[in-house]
From Swiss-Prot:
It comes from Escherichia coli (strain K12). It is found in: Cell inner membrane. Residues 1-8, 75-83 are cytoplasmic. This is Inner membrane protein YgiZ. Keywords: Cell inner membrane, Cell membrane, Membrane, Transmembrane, Transmembrane helix. The chain crosses the membrane at residues 9-29, 54-74, 84-104. GO terms for cellular component: plasma membrane. Pfam families: DUF2645 (PF10840). Residues 30-53, 105-110 are periplasmic.
């Protein structure tokens, strides 16, 4: 029983790390990243418009969070409440990470 719970937590952490890496590498691209000099910060380059960031965020959420939502619904249907709450918590963390990558890191630039 404890081994299964530890495995579930490990799977959730692995999914969070994979999602963060995929969003940062493939979905949160900025067409001005080539202007970033070594030692410079993100505020020194122009940023992509808000509409483009919303579109990128929605595409990333569709591809990366849909499997997690399906898993949450399955765990709820099967009445496996520990796994359900672990994956709901993972979904929340993935949403916060996505917010940070698309909008949060630009807060201090304005």
């Amino acid at each position: 029983m404890l081994k299964q719970k530890i495995k579930t937590i490990f799977e959730a952490l692995l999914y969070i790390m994979l999602t963060y890496w995929l969003i940062d590498s493939f979905f949160a691209f900025n067409k001005y990243d080539w202007m970033l000099e070594s030692g410079g910060n993100i505020c020194s380059i122009p940023s992509v418009s808000g509409e483009d960031r919303i579109l990128q965020a929605m595409i990333a959420a569709f591809f990366l969070l849909t499997p997690l939502i399906i898993l949450i619904l399955r765990k709820l249907f099967m009445r496996e409440m520990f796994e359900f709450w672990v994956y709901v918590f993972s979904l929340g963390i993935c949403l916060v990470c996505g917010w940070w990558l698309f909008w949060g890191r630009f807060i201090f630039c304005y």
